[in-house]
């Protein structure tokens, strides 16, 4: 079985977006819930069920979502206002299912929004794709990179991992940016750790644009264990390597978000906004516009994608 992806991105899937009516981006001022209340709500949602994942894959997702909830939670994030029919959705036959959880940042927070999702797509040829995604986007008031985690199970013995802090500046023109967010944080050691495993190989996206967006320390790899231990070895790699590495990179990113950060002037802010908008628009165009209606039908696709476009503000 082969998997071909153009751009794993900060969208909840590797499908598509249509021209849909734009929703107001005004963010409702819900009363802030305690961290425990927020955890109870998200744990009771379809998102945290992960019915199709192996234990190590599920534990990795729970770790990352819990880290966001615990450390950002009430001080930075509004409660999710995703409608119930978008929080969990499926096609008519139930062969394609998905969840979507989004929390936008409060006005005073550098967080624009955080997003978590999973997709289960049964294939006509047999088997299924299971796509899990967690993303954190920042406002233009800071130049902190965006966070992106995506783990795709193409088969019990074949995974694709995309884990990166996505740069928001051209690193060639901004060597200080490279030093602050990538060299001083020693992100390269995580990529090198995975690279030492014989089952892990670099994954080259068919999209040249995507390759340009990824940072120098970005992890874009395939994990293939078709010889010997097979599925058991895949689970071991997730448990012993992918999970701790993902947790460490999430911790580094959250530390950046809640730290003092870099004061961004008006001119630089406009440049950041333009770059962020272009990346979001391209991600929607490449990953969402064509395949989601095929997988879920037009009505479901329009409903889900309308919410995504609203949050992306594109």
Where are these regions (language model features)?
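N-terminal chloroplast transit peptides
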Residues: 1-40
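Extended, non-transmembrane interaction/recognition domains
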Residues: 128-261, 265-266
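Short glycine-rich, low-complexity/disordered patches
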Residues: 77-89, 203, 258-272
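Intrinsically disordered, low-complexity proline-rich segments enriched in Ser/Thr
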Residues: 9, 13, 80, 117, ...
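Short Lys/Arg-enriched alpha/beta "domain-start" segment
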Residues: 35-140
